[in-house]
Regions:
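Structural signature of tandem-repeat unit edges
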Residues: 6-20, 29-42, 52-65, 75-89, ...
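Extracellular/lumenal glycan-associated surfaces
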Residues: 68-73, 182-186
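Extracellular/surface-exposed low-complexity segments
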Residues: 101-128
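Consensus positions within tandem repeat domains that build extended binding/scaffold surfaces
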Residues: 1-3, 22-25, 44-49, 67-70, ...
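A short, polar beta-strand/turn micro-motif
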Residues: 126-152, 173-235
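Extracytoplasmic/secreted cell-surface and envelope-processing proteins
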Residues: 89-91, 112-115, 192-193
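Extracellular/surface-exposed low-complexity repeats and stalk/linker segments enriched in Gly/Pro
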Residues: 78-93, 165-172, 220
């Protein structure tokens, strides 16, 4: 319990296969901004209590109950991404003292079930997820499967090959990206609407991009390979 209480963590990348985050683990981590909880991971009571800078959190589909005070006093919370088709129960005070403007994002097929079950926040439950391009090309990744099918003017691409000289890339367009896939988005600057996938996303087995939520250590496996760091679409 209280493993990282009041620490100065600004980001955390939780490993796939993590079984549980214990009670009050990140209590009072006031610089933590975004969290994506891996599939099949359970969370304990008060796990992100008083993380006052936390803006976005992605909850996996196996979460059947959002525990007591899990996100209480997360006063900067803007978006909760609920990836499950089954509506989870809410224990007491799980979203107590959060912003009245927080949005709850769900799959299109689950929209009406969430609105009916969570009727006290029904006006803030939506399946329309805004994505803002601040330049005509930028990097992108999310902790849930993303459907770009109806985002007119916005293209999502994986990188399938590259030429060493000048880091020239070969792209492949996809419409449905798996969670945590590194992507390049292209389009005019502005805000587009994407959705969570209701069915299986495209395969990205050939994608060379690796997503990172924060700092990352990159190490060559051989002396003949150059690694490139891509930030906002540029190397």
């Amino acid at each position: 319990h209280h493993a990282f209480k009041h620490s100065g963590l600004s980001y955390v990348q939780l490993p796939v296969g993590l079984q549980k985050i214990d009670e009050w683990a990140f209590e009072g981590c006031k610089q933590l901004r975004n969290v994506s909880i891996p599939a099949q991971t359970q969370i304990g009571a008060g796990v992100f209590y008083n993380c006052s800078a936390l803006q976005n959190v992605t909850l996996p589909s196996n979460i059947t109950t959002i525990p007591f005070m899990a996100f209480s006093a997360c006063s900067s919370l803007e978006g909760v991404y609920l990836t499950g088709s089954t509506v989870p129960n809410r224990d007491a005070y799980c979203f107590d003292n959060v912003s009245a403007a927080v949005q709850y994002y769900v799959k299109p097929s689950a929209l009406m079930a969430y609105k009916s079950s969570w009727n006290d926040v029904a006006d803030r439950i939506t399946d329309e997820i805004p994505v803002t391009l601040t330049s005509t090309k930028m990097t992108f990744s999310r902790g849930f499967d993303v459907d770009f099918t109806n985002a007119s003017g916005l293209e999502a691409k994986v990188v399938t090959d590259y030429r060493e000289n000048g880091a020239q890339l070969e792209y492949a367009k996809i419409e449905k990206a798996p969670a945590n896939t590194g992507l390049i988005l292209t389009g005019r600057q502005g805000t587009y609407i994407v959705k969570m996938c209701d069915n299986e996303p495209n395969s990205v087995a050939t994608n060379l991009l690796k997503a990172s939520v924060g700092g990352a250590w990159v190490e060559n496996t051989t002396t003949e390979v150059t690694n490139y760091i891509c930030v906002n679409g540029n190397f």
